[in-house]
Amino acid sequence: MGKNQLEVIKAKLVSPETNEKLKVLPKWIKKDVLIAAFWNALFKNPQLQQCTPESLLNALLKCAEWGLLPGGDNVYLIPRHNNKKPGRPLECNAQRGYQGLIELIYRVTGAEVEAHVVYENDKFDYQLGTDAYVHHKPAPKNPGKPYLAYAVWRKDDKESFDIIRME
């Protein structure tokens, strides 16, 4: 990242306008922690460092709106060329990861969620309907290729699940 680009991004992050927008942060995330996590993600990916300052700020504000820290599996910061703008500028896009979705589901509904991947050599069985169940025993060695994923959520002694095939 060029020094000028870095200065522009820093100026955007500490501007009064940004401080006003970051007031949407939930109590459990401090502004300094969010910005530190954002910078950490930014410096781990050189392509993000080439993104427009405006798109980086928008990605930061999305993280604040969701109450999720970027990095890990909560929020992915993805650089993409915007083909609809002249010069196809590189822009940063914030996308919730599976752990971020699980966190939001828990916050909104109070439901506990587990997500798992099933591999070719795992023992896996499920049934839909009124007597629905999921049984999954991971292979102890050499799991093979992943072929489906599933999520189980629980709340108030009730359980439900959904299965997604990977094709």
Predicted regions and their residues:
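Binding-interface segments
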Residues: 4-167
